[in-house]
Amino acid sequence: MQRALKAWFVPVLLGVTPVWADTVACHIIYGGENFSVSAQPTAEPYKVKGEKIGRYFEFKAVYATSPADLAAISIYVYGTSSGESVLIHQAKFASGIGNDAAPWGFTGFQYVYEPSKSSELQYWCEKTP
């Protein structure tokens, strides 16, 4: 019993997320292609990098776990047609949210439009063990 408690407390004290923590998996459709972006729990949300999706989008999923009062899952979609990343969609969910909007995870099925090129990106995200 004492060994099991040490195995749980040591990662928490070091600020490391246990390997059994949930992750966020986002499924993206753009231009007839499927993309996947995953987000691991992190205590440093500003260090998470976005992923380029096609020519005109960048997608970033952030699963912030600490501090506990600010823990959340944030989804950002940027338009990149001008050469710079411009935020065009943002969604935020409580970190304890479940996949209640099944079959489309906790976000439901979302549509995002890039205004200058009339491009459409679709996505949905789910928590996975």
What are these regions (language model features)?
Residues 1-9:
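Bacterial N-terminal signal peptides that target proteins for export
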Residues 22-129:
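Cysteine-centric segments in proteins
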Residues 16-21:
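N-terminal signal peptide c-region/cleavage motif recognized by signal peptidases
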